[in-house]
Amino acid sequence: MKENPLLTVEGLTASFATESGRLPAVENVSFQINPGEALGLVGESGCGKSVTALSIMRLLPRPAGRIDRGRVLLGDTDLAILPAERMRTFRGSRLAMVFQEPMTALNPVHSIGKQLREAFRLHEHIADKGLADGKAVNLLRQVGIPDPERRLKEFPHQISGGMRQRVMIAMALACDPDLLIADEPTTALDVTIQAQILDLIKAQQQKRGLSLLLITHDLGVIAETCDRLCVMYAGRIVETADVFTLFTRPAHPYTRGLLASIPRLENQRKTRLAVIPGMVPALSELPPGCRFQNRCPQARDICRDREPPDITVADGHAAACYFAGPEKEPHATG
């Protein structure tokens, strides 16, 4: 029997108020995450990955940002229309988020211990400081922080960037959420620490049976961590597949461009890396039809006239491209 998804995002559109009027940062975004599954959301900076995550968490900056339409179902509960007070109880207990920059996400004037105790007080109604500190010490130990009793008394500026991110992961896991959202969790960390943080997130996800939404621009991170992935471009999802399929048989020209631009150690020839020409269009200057058509080597008149629907390539594999269907060759010109 097929398992019901933990998270279902349907037709999500979120916009921001600008001098040019309201502009959609994400438009008609749809995907699902099953219980215990790790889904990657990948794309260039500004494509709408973080806005998607903030929309799920109902943390878009107000009043500029808002969800215009769509559903965000956590089980049977639509988070998009949940009253604010009830949504606050869901954050932390049902879903939690690890943000890009822990120094700005942590409160600089409160100790690590106080911030962890606050999570226990709000979501588990634990008022006893000794009991909360015991749980906090155990949690810090689980995320690999040495001497956790001492760390409880320290402030965010007193620990390293990698340690701060471990604290953020501990805070996100404090109340055993069903869904963990990690938004570029290794930003500004050196390569060695990046690998440790990603290993920690994956280990905790598997140990606790969490569902994971991992947001990144790094396809290598996706390959190591996720089961499936969605590729975003200019506010829309252009391809969805399991990791193996997408890396071996990408169907959308943008996905192929991303994969072609990855440096390969086995390539000993002194050749230039492949690049995707042009720039991602500004939200106020989106072209008609396919949003990738100005940069696409396969673009034809139909791409400029009409926005492509999601074409089913195979079971579990879809791409928003007129030339992605199974009846076409991978590089068909129509």
Language-model segments: which ranges?
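ABC-type ATPase nucleotide-binding domains, specifically the catalytic core motifs of the NBD
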Residues: 17-20, 58-64, 82, 87, ...
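Conserved ABC ATPase "signature" region
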Residues: 75-78, 131-150, 259-260
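ABC ATPase NBD coupling module
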Residues: 79-96, 122, 245-250, 281-287
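Short catalytic/signature loops enriched in Gly
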Residues: 5, 146-150, 240-334
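A short, proline-enriched helix->beta-strand linker immediately N-terminal to the Walker B motif
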Residues: 174-178
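P-loop NTP-binding/switch modules centered on Walker-like glycine-rich loops
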Residues: 44, 181, 185, 189-271
